Amino acid sequence: MKEHIFNKFIDNILKHTGLSREDFFSKSQNGEIVLARQTLFYLCSKRGLTTAMIKQYMENNECHLTRPPITYGVSIVEGLLKEDSDLQNVIDKLSIVD
């Protein structure tokens, strides 16, 4: 059930950013792609997915990460939310799961 939430967040992020699924799960360090992944980690953590679950779901998509980048990504987005009030509106839209 939680994997459905993970996948819905990815769909929302890809639609919002215009990124391809292939780019999203690539090893790219492009700022836009990294921020999209960090946003996914943040959304998942706020919905109760553990770091281990996020790591497993990323691996299911051939994107192998250790846990520190996931927790770091969550903290980055939390910091950005404190600085950018418009970002909260984007996060709210991305967090909608049917």
Could you describe each region identified by the protein language model?
Residues 45, 70-81:
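DNA major-groove recognition helix of helix-turn-helix
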